[in-house]
């Protein structure tokens, strides 16, 4: 079955108020299709809730940015754990704490053009990997 056809039908049923139970390890599908998520390990629920709430519980620790500042310089900013160049040209910053978002915004906005600055929580895929690494 074509994945896109299945996704369309799930979203169609969802729009009609149907409850759909969907099991998948591909967290991008889960984010796209599900309102709520449950992660289970050895029969025990280890994470449960609205996908938006679950993501936000982990903090706004990701920043997506387009700027003239080099990735090397971005990686040196206090609070940046890692900087990664994405295929679309944006740079993804992994923060040690959401509070560093203010500092990073201040640094980038001092007389410099910022095409994109988006602070978000980790994706469900990142949360899944983190939880799986902890033995869920």
Task: Say what each PLM segment does.
Residues 8-94:
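ABC transporter nucleotide-binding domain
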Residues 1-5, 9:
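Short alpha-helix in the ABC/ABC-like ATPase nucleotide-binding domain
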Residues 62-136:
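Short, charged/small-residue-rich alpha-helical element at the C-terminal edge
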């Amino acid at each position: 079955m074509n994945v896109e056809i299945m996704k369309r039908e799930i979203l169609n049923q969802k729009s009609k108020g149907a409850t759909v139970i969907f099991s998948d390890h591909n967290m991008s599908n889960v984010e796209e299709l599900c309102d709520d998520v449950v992660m289970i390990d050895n029969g025990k629920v280890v994470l449960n809730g609205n996908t938006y709430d679950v993501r936000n519980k982990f903090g706004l620790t990701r920043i997506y940015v387009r700027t003239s500042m080099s990735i090397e310089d971005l990686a040196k900013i206090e609070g940046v754990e890692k900087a990664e160049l994405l295929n679309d040209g944006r740079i993804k910053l992994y923060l040690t704490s959401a509070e560093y978002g203010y500092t990073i915004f201040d640094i980038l906005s001092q007389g410099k053009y910022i095409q994109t600055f988006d602070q978000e929580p980790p994706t469900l895929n990142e949360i899944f990997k983190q939880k799986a690494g902890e033995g869920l």
